[in-house]
Amino acid sequence: MVFADRADAGRRLADQLVRFRDVPDVLVVGLPRGGVPVARQVAEALHAPLDVMLVRKLGVPGQRELAMGAIGEGGVRILNDDIVAYHQVSVDEIEQVAAQESAELRRRAAQFRGDRGPVELAGKIVVVVDDGLATGATARAACQAARQRGAAHVVLAVPVAPHDWVQRMGTSADEYVCVGAPRQFFAVGNFYDDFAQTSDAEVVECLRSSAGPPAPATAARRVRVRGVVQGVGFRPFVHALASSLGLVGSVGNDDEGVIIDAEGPPASLDEFARRLRDEAPPLASVTAVEVCPVVSTGARTFTIAASAAGDGPPAGGAAALPPDTAVCADCVREMFDPADRRYRHPFITCTNCGPRFTIAVGVPYDRVNTTMAAFELCPACAAEYHDPDNRRFHAQPVSCHDCGPTLELVTADGAVTARGDEAVRACQQLLDHGAIVAVKGIGGYHLMCDARNDDAVTLLRLRKRRGDKPLAVMVADLGVLDGVAEPNGAERGALLARQRPIVLLRRVDRSGRADSPIWPESVAGRASEVGVMLPYAPVHLLLFDGLGTDVLVCTSGNVADEPIVVDDTDALSRLGTLADAWLRHDRPIHRPCDDSVIRVVTETPGDGVMPVRRSRGWVPLPVDIGTWPGQELPGVLALGGDLKNVVCVTAGRQAWLSQHLGDLGELSSYQAAQAAVQQLLALTRVRPSVVAIDAHPGYLSGRLGRQVAAAMGVPVIAVQHHHAHVVSALAEWRLLDSIDDDHPVIGVAFDGTGYGPDGSIWGGEVLLVGPQRARRVGHLAAVPLPGGDAAIEHPSRAALSHLWAAGCAWDPRLACVAATSEHELATLRTQFERSVATVPTSSMGRLFDAVAALAGVRQAVDYEAQAAIELQAAADGGERGSYRFPGADRDGAIDAAPVIRAVVDDVLAGTPCGVVSTRFHRAVAEMVRVEAARAAAMVATPTVVLSGGVFQNATLATMCTELLLADGFDVRVHRMVPTNDGGLALGQAVVAGALFAAGGEMGKD
């Protein structure tokens, strides 16, 4: 197969594209220079317009032929993050290269087009043409640039390419067309008799002489918009945009998102499609704009049509519900304006704020499908709802004092003592006098009290069985934090974001100062951080207006480890021993949704957000997980673990994680998980092909998964705990298509408990991880752990276990020994000697507990990871010393005994706890560095993933990341889902989906 020249190649290529001849909205673009003469022949044969696609490679400084990305017209920029990180290209260097290539882009654009601008791509079928494909780097960038400029469908067409070119290009284009793809391929020019270089003048002539057919005066198009486009004011936005452009037609919601029929001049329709994405409302997230020509309906105006609901799974995926968001500034301004009819209305909302996920009972998102359906609009609200010029045009939860809902204050006997604004005033008086009030918000009830009233805080801890566990606070404004915490710019941004999460802020050390506030100590105890959030519901702002305090304890309305209470009757019974009064309203909460918790960490890769609990403000937004090599994953339901339970549904590129559900050991949490499974399946319309569970045979989540799978008639796949942890991070970074089981990444999974295939408890693991398999190549040497849960609740037991394994005497001068009775010591000694009632564990979490107990930090805990949290808080930032782990033995076991012996020596020598803590943290980080290097020698990979609950420790995560980056590794930590068990279900779903898609039996339950 040899072409005479580029014109001959273009004509033969056009024969492969005849189905696009005379099709509206087809545009041909050639890649300068050599691709343009080929594209000219294609454009003329298809009767389509011709333009150039200007793309410039961004070369690595000093290695210009190595592409670290590309730029295109319209501000399109594509970066290969892996190349940038591996070659340590700085932001300044990227900008310098981009500036040089941008200048060349402008020069070429002016030379090729003259006074004409680029042809609009939005909504078009774009055929990208080159004279051949070798590496595909430029073609790939051109396709991505076309997508970013709004192309509805991208076709990559070349005369000749290597035989495996479609696999190389992956998902860059929607279609691939080629005249020939020989196995013996050396260079494009080998397939042309005449392959003379194309000049700039020839490109200009091709563009000048290749004019497409005259555009019709009007056209009709159907536009499908996908993403978070319901409940965010998208239909009013579309109505306003279409009207401003003189278009006619309609817009409506359906099961898949928003559907638009629009008619008007083609240029206006092009602009309309582009602006749908570029100017979407603030709460919207547009993932796709799909355009196709249709027959005119003869519409004369542009209207909002009634929503359409279908049966069964939508072909293109279910519409995405938006999460609940904080009240916006416009609504706050109205709420405190005495002249406004919504003055002090506790349920004020608009298209840009308020509850969504928690009040929606189904899709499409319309008032009739929300818990606001029971509240009939008053004439004034109805007029606003139907007025295109009003900011509450089609705002589904709109309400006022006349239409409801209504606040009321209730006492323990169920008596209503005040309503409306009087209920707010009465609640303020109770809080000012030290009472604990259960306040119903957006996602459930909170228990609130004055954080500056130490007696009230102590009483709340006692009633809630909270022990020393830190309590979150809600502050009236950021000024309240003066002298308590000094949030940086990123932390302030997180506090003020529309999600309004609880942000963990490092406390300022003001010990011993007379002006030191007392409340941080009472709410946070010995933790180094305090959890802070700002008011996000209108009722919160009303409570602070006139309240005697500017900081309230704001903790979930539940008993420890149970889900947050949402039902009013349940609130009186389940919170009856906790609260003195209830400030509630009559708007039902369909789905419970606890507050999200995040930490901002700027020293590690990513945008700095480390999710600790992903719930209100983020749920139910899907996580884009990309594709697994060569295909999309099947529908999977994953049940997560028993602690911090979250369930997950995946289909294609998307994963939907539920809100935080609690610990399944509590019956109410187990029931909440059952409900969440059904709600998530109904919301996403996914019909799972397989159910994923944790490999632990005794987990309640596994039992639930088996029950659901049996009811659906689908198989169950059990996934090893730490494999799931690492893969969850790979999924959120969309790295699944860059690895396989023969080319794994290095996964470091540190946590407290995870069931190992050998029946022991794992938790200090170094793994080689692919989508289907994880190979254990390193781990802490196992030590015997006595007593199951008792060892978790008493770090002293972990310390005694590690002392025994290290051959250290149980010296009574050690705090862990002194805290244990002689009888218990004798019992434990017998258990160790006879290997009775102990389980071997390689848990890093238990090693942290052991060191905390040895250092005298904590011998018993009131909440999970308390000892490790306080050990981290005690760390001395000025200490530069370190303990040292030995290298792994031939089986990959890493003995902690030398570290334990060094800790004992330091403690008995009177070394301060902070020094011991820092030396231990540094030892663990150095061990991770050494093990990563050892694992990298087994497989050629630069990627290390850090996952598991231990990496919530920001000190350790930062130390590990810095050491690994210095060694040239590409380090990935969690940024979208929690590193703890709250992210486990995502990893389970991906592993099970990969196994199921491959027909594998591995891990089947």
Report the location of each language-model feature.
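Conserved phosphate-binding/catalytic loops in two-lobed NTP-binding clefts
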Residues: 51, 157-159, 175-186, 694, ...
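PRPP-associated nucleotide enzymes
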Residues: 1-218
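A phosphate-binding glycine/aspartate-rich beta-alpha loop in the early core of alpha/beta enzymes
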Residues: 47-80, 293, 436, 444-509
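Intrinsically disordered, low-complexity, mixed-charge
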Residues: 214-408
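Ligand-binding beta-strand-loop-alpha-helix segment within the catalytic cores
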Residues: 101, 401, 465, 469-553
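Glycine-rich phosphate-binding/hydrolytic loop that grips phosphoryl groups
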Residues: 186, 722-735, 745-750, 755-756, ...
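Internal gly/pro-rich beta-alpha loop/helix module
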Residues: 279, 368, 384, 547-629, ...
